[in-house]
Amino acid sequence: VPDEYFECFLEELPFSVPGPPCTDEHVRAYTGLVPDCLIAYWQEFGFSGFGNGVAWLVDPLEWKVTTEEVLLDAIQHPRLGEGAQYIPFARGAFGKTFFWTPGYGISLTVEPARGTVFFWAPPKGIERAMQSFFTASGKEQFDFFDRNEKPMFDRVHEHLGSLQFDEVYGFSPGLRIGGASNVDSAHLFQIHVHMAFLRTAIGDDWYVLG
């Protein structure tokens, strides 16, 4: 049974798309690095989609290469040293990804479609930081907003259908190379391939927020 914090999340974004299960390897690799509550969520729900797939729990083992060699190859939180570890734990349907750093808390939000990175300030209480994230997370946290600030998930979901755990909605051409954020430009992509494509388009020009 999920804790009261994740229950709040599920009320907003119900369990929708089953993903791969959490294994003993995940538990061994990440116990002590991420909060116990996150491992409990993995064990109960696996790396699955919520709210029709607008939000996902991320498998950090499966994302290891994409995290270290693709997305974060040139990103370092200004408050953290070179050896800081960034563990992806949640993502949106359009690829926005949230990272946890052991001993710090939630550290980064990366939105590759736009080429933006947000550096989080340290939380007031690290022991509740992960639970607070899920309690406060609604659909808008994971959605993508077009140039008119209108949320796109429902329209794209209706147009393309549901995502699987290793898929992402993206735009072709990409936004950083002149593409438009509209439903007709949206496509389904294999997530790691698309992340690598977006990273190439960003080059050295990440937009820093926060």
Residue positions per predicted region:
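A surface-exposed partner-binding patch
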Residues: 1-106, 163-210
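Compact, glycine/acidic-enriched structural inserts
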Residues: 107-147
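Noncatalytic linker/hinge segments flanking ATPase motor cores
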Residues: 79-81, 95-102, 128-141, 150-153
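Mixed-charge (acidic/basic) macromolecular-recognition segments
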Residues: 133-185
